Amino acid sequence: MYLFVNIIWRNFISKNNLPKANREIRAREVRLVDENSEMHGVVNIREALDMAERAGLDLVEISPNAVPPVCKILDFGKFKYENKKRLHEARKKQKIVVLKEMKFKPNISIGDFETKLRKIKEFLKDGDKVKISLWFKGREILHKEVGHELFKRIELALEGLIKIDQHAKMEGKQMIMIISPDIKV
């Protein structure tokens, strides 16, 4: 029973994002475009199906919202393949931007600062955004100017490589700044 329902559900989902073809088209009249992209005007659905059958191709509803719907005579298998290929190419070209975080403390040593700075540069080269957070503990929060100085040092060290998306601001017991790679570089 479960397998049967699963097969029906899978077919229901996969058919929803495809255009209607051949006998699935419910309109009485359609605006027909043949395989050579020539307009035949408004035609009865039976005539359109006969023309598609004679050509050995399928009648595919291209624009279902038009009145009457626009249908084209073409190879539906090839149409699905090209559509799938186009979606795959678009997905491949998509760039996912990741937000990386680098945590600092107000009294960071020079060596640790340079190491973290080197890691931030790697993140920026990969095209990722970086959230720089400065954690204050106890009474360190009374000296926010130390945090601002640290962020200025970071900005100067990365000058020309970054674009500041969000300037330094306090959120609870931490100061945050978000940077991204400068596109010009």
From Swiss-Prot:
One of its GO terms (molecular function) is ribosome binding. This is Translation initiation factor IF-3. It comes from the Bacteria. InterPro entries: T_IF-3_C_sf, T_IF-3_N_sf, Translation_initiation_fac3_CS, Translation_initiation_fac_3, Translation_initiation_fac_3_C, Translation_initiation_fac_3_N. The keyword Transmembrane does not apply. Gene3D superfamilies: Translation initiation factor 3 (IF-3), C-terminal domain, Translation initiation factor 3 (IF-3), N-terminal domain. Keywords: Cytoplasm, Initiation factor, Protein biosynthesis. It is found in: Cytoplasm. The lineage of its organism: Bacteria, Pseudomonadati, Pseudomonadota, Alphaproteobacteria, Rickettsiales. GO terms for biological process: ribosome disassembly. Monomer. IF-3 binds to the 30S ribosomal subunit and shifts the equilibrium between 70S ribosomes and their 50S and 30S subunits in favor of the free subunits, thus enhancing the availability of 30S subunits on which protein synthesis initiation begins. The gene is infC. HAMAP family: IF_3. Belongs to the IF-3 family. The keyword DNA-binding does not apply. One of its GO terms (cellular component) is cytosol. Transmembrane segments: none annotated. It holds the Pfam family IF3_C.
